[in-house]
Amino acid sequence: MNISRMEQRVLHVLAQGGYIRHQREDGHICEIECFTREGYLLSDCTMAVFQQLRRKRLIESRMGSPYRISFKGRENVRAQLNNR
């Protein structure tokens, strides 16, 4: 599956334990914020990247909770070197 650089960056943060918090208005998602595991805000996660990840089913939300990486997303994320 083709995954853009921005999608890959967001997926990598989610794979390490991050999450995407969303705000709804009239049943539609109007605002998103992507947080790393340490609690920092990731500025690379835009609404367009979020919609692409949802369309490809690489992220999922269960019962209104924040969006996290799905099993399909874990399979498609490429490994990256960490400082840890």
UniProtKB/Swiss-Prot annotation:
<comment type="similarity">
    <text>Belongs to the UPF0386 family.</text>
</comment>
<dbReference type="Pfam" id="PF09857">
    <property type="entry name" value="YjhX_toxin"/>
</dbReference>
<protein>
    <recommendedName>
        <fullName>UPF0386 protein Oant_1614</fullName>
    </recommendedName>
</protein>
<dbReference type="InterPro" id="IPR018654">
    <property type="entry name" value="YjhX_toxin"/>
</dbReference>
